[in-house]
Amino acid sequence: PADLIAKEKEIAEAKAVELEAIQKSMEALEDRKTNIRVGYVYVISNIGAFGERMVKIGMTRRLEPLDRVRELGDASVPFRYDVHALIFSRDAVSLETRLHQKFVEQRVNFVNNRREFFYVTPAEVKIALEEIHNEANDLTGDVLSFDEWAEAEEFRISESQRKLQNV
């Protein structure tokens, strides 16, 4: 009986932890539903498709922000995108807007502002993020990752193979 009680107590504690995680997930979903400004700002590049001086600065409200990046790179470009920055913000809309404003003169498409490509490097975006953080650190939220280097694995392997074939 003591072993049975201990086992039941262990199961109950595990269920309590599981229930707490579910409640937190539900709270996060409710927060997103009531606050449409919450989300992730991402900075991505595709040097194989666009060269080394072009990034896309976008925003997503998805719980899994990398799903959006994968979706962008699925069929419309020859290589996968590299993620340079992923920033969670309680006001991702304003953060994205501020970044776009910082690079308004480097915008690739002046006709359609929904095309969020800019002639800048990831390093320049990092500097802009630091400036925005100093001006209004509540916008920048949590920088989950930042990497200035574009791995561009598929592109680099393809270029190496192309050079070998042309020898």
Q: Model features per residue range: what roles?
A:
Residues 1-167:
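Non-catalytic accessory segments flanking enzymatic or RNA/DNA-binding domains
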